[in-house]
């Protein structure tokens, strides 16, 4: 029997608010354990939650950017469960009345043969909730864990997709696009290493063409988008194999083991009834005004898909260039600033940013915001090349200095005296001397041995210390040899 997978993703995103969701404790990463807490974070009796206005505002932006309907009335609820890093033994979240509903995200998926297809993934809801604390397990082998409540109470949104995803690759592309959007609108840094973005996958299979859903498993412990893809693909194969062997699929939570590329059963999967949801009596109904939603709309920047379409239209760049440049909104802005400064070479500027600039940033573990050279300086490189002032080789040499000092290319060329030799008379003098010193190569060339011409070009470039204009060197050399 042929099966198809039905996959839904639950993506938790920590918002980059100044303070936590329901108290005034700072929302920062990396502080010493239990230094960013208060009686409310620690669930002391009698402490009351106060809804963070910035959290609400950023959630509205996230909903609008993912084509959701913003509900003017929404309600917080309590989700009850026992875990050491949850001191109140319940989490403040939203259940029946979330703030964002009925959205969608469009993705493009590449096939193995190089073709691609577009797909729209529906978003069931985006709701607000508070984060739990963190357990730090003893690394000496003792059966001991420490509780760090710095993260407890931090602002989270949970983005729940409909089960419209069919493969690990589709999940990967969905997460990639979602991350881009949330970074573009500045609601989160989406750093998986710091726990700012976490993803769980609900995976089930059913006979192809069937409309009934199979028994689902929830897969956790995936710390990269690549691992999400691998875990889902493994779980699909595992479930198909189990059904073909006459086994039943258990509704359970499974953990992904990246070393073995397998999923392993952890516990039976809870249902909503197990959490005993009910409206939080300490938080009134959240009522939004039209102007609050309109303000969030006004703050939305050009989103990734819009930017991709515009770059294609304005600069006629290849798709691969557009994908790389729009990975980061700041990088795309940097590119456009460079092209505006020198509109003649949009493709060459794109190549330079993708290769030279990105290589430097990756080496230094920096972002484009940390990059010293201005966009106009990248543009000036190509202006100098087109004017014959420098060669491509010299451009790479001065680029290293630009990265260290932030100086303009023209200033570095002037300071180091490495301007390209483009004076025909000067080149002719140098070339005639080279020919005098290499009579055998001259004779070989005139005897039809074209390779000797390359040797003479090399000797000329050596004589100019690499600063000869390559095009002029070739032209003048051929002219003199033909005399």
Curated annotation (Swiss-Prot):
A molecular function GO annotation: ATP binding
UniProt keyword list: ATP-binding, Ligase, Nucleotide-binding, Protein biosynthesis
Biological process according to GO: glutaminyl-tRNAGln biosynthesis via transamidation; translation
Catalytic activity: L-glutamyl-tRNA(Gln) + L-glutamine + ATP + H2O = L-glutaminyl-tRNA(Gln) + L-glutamate + ADP + phosphate + H(+); L-aspartyl-tRNA(Asn) + L-glutamine + ATP + H2O = L-asparaginyl-tRNA(Asn) + L-glutamate + ADP + phosphate + 2 H(+)
Subunit relationships: Heterotrimer of A, B and C subunits.
Family: Belongs to the GatB/GatE family. GatB subfamily.
Protein's name in the database: Aspartyl/glutamyl-tRNA(Asn/Gln) amidotransferase subunit B
Species per Swiss-Prot/TrEMBL record: Brachyspira hyodysenteriae (strain ATCC 49526 / WA1)
């Amino acid at each position: 029997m042929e099966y198809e997978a039905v996959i839904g993703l639950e993506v938790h995103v920590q918002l980059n608010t100044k303070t936590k969701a329901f108290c005034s404790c700072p929302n920062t990463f990396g502080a010493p354990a239990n230094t960013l807490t208060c009686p409310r974070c620690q669930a002391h009796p009698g402490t009351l939650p106060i809804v963070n206005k910035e959290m609400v505002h950023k959630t509205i932006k996230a909903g609008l950017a993912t084509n959701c309907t913003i509900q003017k009335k929404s309600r917080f609820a309590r989700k009850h469960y026992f875990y050491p890093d949850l001191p109140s033994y319940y989490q403040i979240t939203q259940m029946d009345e979330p703030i964002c509903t009925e959205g969608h995200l469009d993705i493009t998926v590449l096939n193995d043969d190089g073709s691609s297809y577009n797909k729209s993934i529906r978003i069931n809801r985006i709701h607000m909730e508070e984060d739990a604390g963190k357990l730090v397990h003893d690394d000496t082998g003792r059966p001991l864990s420490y509780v760090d409540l710095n993260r407890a109470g931090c602002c989270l949104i949970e983005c729940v997709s409909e089960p419209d995803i069919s493969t690990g690759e589709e999940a990967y592309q969905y997460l990639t696009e979602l991350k881009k959007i949330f970074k573009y609108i500045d609601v989160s840094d989406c750093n998986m290493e710091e726990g700012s973005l976490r993803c769980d996958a609900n995976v089930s299979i059913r006979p192809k063409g069937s409309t009934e859903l199979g028994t689902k498993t929830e897969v956790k412990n995936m710390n990269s988008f690549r691992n999400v893809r691998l875990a889902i693909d493994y779980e699909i194969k595992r479930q198909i194999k189990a059904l073909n062997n006459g086994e039943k699929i258990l509704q359970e939570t499974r953990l992904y083991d990246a070393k073995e590329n397998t999923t392993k059963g952890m516990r039976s999967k809870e249902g909503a009834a197990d959490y005993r949801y009910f409206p939080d009596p300490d938080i009134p109904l959240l009522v939004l005004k039209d102007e609050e939603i309109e303000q969030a709309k006004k703050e939305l920047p050009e989103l990734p898909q819009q930017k991709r379409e515009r770059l294609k239209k304005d600069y006629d760049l290849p798709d691969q260039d557009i994908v790389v440049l729009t990975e980061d909104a700041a990088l795309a802005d940097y590119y456009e600033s460079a092209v505006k400064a020198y509109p003649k070479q949009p493709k060459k500027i794109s190549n330079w940013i993708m290769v030279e600039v990105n290589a430097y940033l990756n080496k230094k573990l920096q972002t484009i915001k940390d990059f010293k050279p201005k966009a106009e300086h990248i543009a000036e490189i190509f202006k100098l090349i087109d004017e014959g002032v420098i060669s491509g080789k010299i451009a790479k040499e001065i680029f290293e200095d630009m990265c260290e000092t932030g100086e303009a290319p023209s200033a570095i060329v002037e300071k180091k005296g490495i301007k390209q030799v483009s004076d025909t008379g000067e080149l002719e003098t140098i070339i005639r001397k080279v020919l005098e010193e290499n009579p055998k190569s001259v004779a070989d060339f005139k005897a039809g041995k074209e390779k000797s011409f390359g040797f003479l070009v090399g000797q000329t470039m050596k004589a100019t210390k690499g600063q000869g204009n390559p095009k002029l060197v070739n032209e003048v050399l051929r002219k003199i040899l033909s005399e």
